[in-house]
Design a protein with these regions (language model features):
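ASCE P-loop NTPase motor core, strongest for the SF2 helicase catalytic module
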Residues: 1-41, 50-251
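Cys/His-rich Zn2+-binding cysteine-cluster or related metal-binding knuckle/ribbon modules and their
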Residues: 46
């Protein structure tokens, strides 16, 4: 999917690597398949690409390879903001209200400014403690406030309690490393056994944690991963539940 999303010339490069005797000229391919500058890929062009790829690639579905695997069950949970989240949401919007109307804030371009606002709103929805000054303290003391001040974490707390009672084992993915820090505080507050993997985890530590999590009789209930660090070379086959706490908008 990535070459088609980025630039179709990348697709030609892959096909040329696989079949150099067939895909000899990139110019012919570019003229035949690349849309005009700024134009969207239309349905006719997509159909032509599908016909081409069907002759070059073998697509094998899960149902063709392993019929014994149960179907994936995907659940989307919608929930309200906590009072603290609602307040911080309002603060973000009021601080940048001019940008929402004009497309500019702080002298930046319109699209960049709006993206920055959206990123702050995403942080509010994940947990208000991602903002400096939101967490009560000092002293900073773990407690129920960590859970109650985030609607998303409050639901996760109830979900994990039921999953643990049912003997399940869980993977949790986050895009923000700071959010992983907050989840780690929550795991320790609830006394859940867990493993953590992010961009600072060495290859040796990564292998050791995977072995420990997958070990028969392991007491590790949770494995929390940052999305980018956890996308390569990970094999956690003993988990049966995946939670996307903060899904990546551009996977």
């Amino acid at each position: 999917g990535t070459p088609i999303q980025n630039h179709l010339h990348e697709l030609w490069a892959l096909l040329n690597f696989l079949y150099p005797e067939v895909f000899t000229s990139s110019d012919v391919f570019d003229v035949s398949f690349n849309p005009k500058a700024g134009a969207h890929i239309g349905s006719e062009l997509v159909t032509q690409l599908h016909l081409l790829l069907q002759r070059c690639l073998l697509r094998r579905l899960k149902m063709d390879v392993e019929k014994g695997l149960p179907p994936k069950t995907e659940t989307k949970i919608f929930l309200p903001l906590s009072p603290m989240q609602a307040e911080w949401y309002r603060r973000v919007l009021m601080r940048d209200v001019s940008a929402l109307g004009t497309g500019r804030a702080g002298g930046g371009t319109g699209s960049t400014s709006i993206q920055n606002i959206v990123m702050h709103l995403r942080k509010v929805c994940n947990h208000p403690y991602l903002f400096e000054g939101a967490e009560p303290g000092p002293p900073f003391i773990e407690g129920e406030h960590l859970i109650q001040n985030s609607g998303k974490l409050a639901v996760l707390d109830k979900l994990l309690r039921r999953l643990k009672e049912g003997g399940h084992r869980v993977l949790i993915f986050c895009t923000m490393t700071r959010m992983v820090d907050i989840l780690q505080d929550y795991f320790e507050y609830r006394r859940y056994e867990y493993c953590r993997l992010d961009g600072t985890t060495s290859t040796t530590e990564r292998e050791e944690m995977m072995r420990e999590f997958n070990r028969p009789g392991s007491d590790k209930f949770l494995f929390v991963l940052s999305t980018r660090a956890g996308g390569l070379g990970i094999n956690l086959f003993t988990a049966d539940t995946v939670v996307l706490y903060d899904s990546d908008w551009n996977p």
